[in-house]
Structure formats: structure tokens, C-alpha cells
């Protein structure tokens, strides 16, 4: 077993028991590592060094300035948890994924850059309501993540084109061609 000794002064436990005052007086920095059975057992420390360390700890615990920031700057507003049905359930119109859905999707191997849009969620819910299948909440979220991954990747990440728009020919001539 490896260990790290935090002082250059090392003494056996027998020597410390025999004459602890002399051992501590000779210790550099007022601290000595005490070994038992060829392994570090504990540290012995002088009262003066202990007082120094406690004063240093107290000084570091105090703030560096008297300016204090408002605590509410650090407090994230807590969202009210949405009641999720226990066990398996069929998809219902008000179903929502968890607030940390993007993080969960990453854990499942689905990298989503943006959260689910209202249109994507409505489409997902409408499809699965019609199917009538039942799954646990986490399984519904996994299905939503996969659905978003496939839907967003199908068009190279671009939004789907509107089938009702009439396309217009490109009127620009590329460089290198005569027009």
C-alpha cells in the first residue's frame, strides 16, 4: 500500500512513546509522522503549530472582503415537479418529458443540440396516442429522444421543406460559367 507522508520528520511509535517531548522539539515545523509496523500511523503535532494551523484555517474561512452578493443570485428557481403516472401508462395529451431531457438523452446515446419543440412533441404525442401502447415514463422519453434523432437527421439537420411551396429556378450563374 502506498502512502504520502506530509512532513520530512519521521519517527517510530516506540521512540515517540519513549520521549515525545524531545522528538517534537527536534521536529522541523512542529510536526512529525509516526510510523508503526513500517507504515504511517498518525501525525504528532506541537501545541504551537496546532495554534498556527487553527488560526490559518479561521483566517481562510472568513470572506476576503465585506462585500456580499445577494443569495438569490445563486439560487436556481425550483420548478414544480410534474406528476408522472407510476408504472406503465398510455400516452396522454399533457405528457411532458423531464426538465433535464437533453442530459438524459445524452446518457442514452442521443446527442440533441436543442430541446424538443412544441411541434415535435405534439407530433410525437399524437402518433403514440393513436397507437395506444403503454410504457414507463423513462421509456417514453427514450422513444422521444430516438424520434427526435431520426427526424432531425433525415434531412441533414435542416428543417423539412413545405410541400406546398412552389420552387423557383436559380437565376445566378456560378463562377467559371458563361451566361
Swiss-Prot record:
Any GO BP annotation: DNA replication, synthesis of primer
GO-annotated cellular components: primosome complex
Signal peptide: none
Gene3D superfamilies: 1.10.8.1180
InterPro entries documented for this protein: DnaT (IPR020917), DnaT_DNA_bind (IPR040480)
Superkingdom to which the source organism belongs: Bacteria
Pfam families linked: DnaT
Keyword entries, A-Z: DNA replication, DNA-binding, Primosome
Record region (Disordered): 156-179
Subunit record text: Homooligomerizes. Interacts with PriB. Component of the replication restart primosome. Primosome assembly occurs via a 'hand-off' mechanism. PriA binds to replication forks, subsequently PriB then DnaT bind; DnaT then displaces ssDNA to generate the helicase loading substrate.
Function: Involved in the restart of stalled replication forks, which reloads the replicative helicase on sites other than the origin of replication. Can function in multiple replication restart pathways. Displaces ssDNA from a PriB-ssDNA complex. Probably forms a spiral filament on ssDNA.
Family annotation (NCBIfam families): PRK02854.1
Family: Belongs to the DnaT family.
Name of the featured protein: Replication restart protein DnaT
Organism whose genome encodes this protein: Escherichia coli O1:K1 / APEC
Lineage: Bacteria, Pseudomonadati, Pseudomonadota, Gammaproteobacteria, Enterobacterales
Amino acid at each position: 500500500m502506498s502512502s504520502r507522508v506530509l512532513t520530512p520528520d519521521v519517527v517510530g511509535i516506540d521512540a515517540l512513546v519513549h520521549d515525545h517531548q524531545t522528538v517534537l522539539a527536534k521536529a522541523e515545523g512542529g510536526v512529525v509522522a509516526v510510523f508503526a509496523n513500517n507504515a504511517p500511523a498518525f501525525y504528532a503535532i506541537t501545541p504551537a503549530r496546532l495554534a498556527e494551523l487553527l488560526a490559518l484555517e479561521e483566517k481562510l474561512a472568513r470572506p476576503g472582503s465585506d462585500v456580499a452578493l445577494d443569495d438569490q443570485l445563486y439560487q436556481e428557481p425550483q420548478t414544480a415537479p410534474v406528476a408522472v403516472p407510476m408504472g406503465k401508462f398510455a400516452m396522454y395529451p399533457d405528457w411532458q418529458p423531464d426538465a433535464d431531457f437533453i442530459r438524459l438523452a445524452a446518457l442514452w446515446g442521443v446527442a440533441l443540440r436543442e430541446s424538443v419543440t412544441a411541434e415535435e412533441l405534439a407530433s410525437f404525442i399524437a402518433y403514440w396516442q393513436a397507437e395506444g401502447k403503454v410504457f414507463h415514463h423513462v421509456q417514453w422519453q427514450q422513444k422521444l429522444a430516438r424520434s427526435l434523432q431520426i427526424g432531425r437527421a433525415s434531412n441533414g439537420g435542416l428543417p423539412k421543406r413545405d410541400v406546398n411551396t412552389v420552387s423557383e429556378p436559380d437565376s445566378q450563374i456560378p463562377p467559371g460559367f458563361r451566361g
